Amino acid sequence: MPERFSPEWIAVLDEAARAVIGVEDFVIQQVITDDQDTAWHVMLSSGPTRVRPGRAEAPDVTFTQDRATAEAIACGELSAGSALTNGRLIVQGATARLAKQREVLARLDAALAAAGVDA
């Protein structure tokens, strides 16, 4: 498996995510702030889900955190809720619409797990 958050890792996510069909267009952006700005975005739609490198033109929701926080959340050492509460994770955008994507995001999580992707 490629190094987490690398361009190769994003490509593996994209390949696995294509099996998931969304309901509506919705873009979720992830930004990791450190010495280098790492970003990717998940594009949900009525077609295959895509994961693309870089920042989206118009994300619906953006999650911003430093690399240590992103790693801790990904490894299960820190919950997103705790990171939000202590200010280590910042969420901006249409959070009410994000909540409506719960079912699609659960399918995406299952597809990534089935493909052995450590997201």
Go through the PLM ranges and name each one.
Residues 1-119:
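Feature captures hydrophobic
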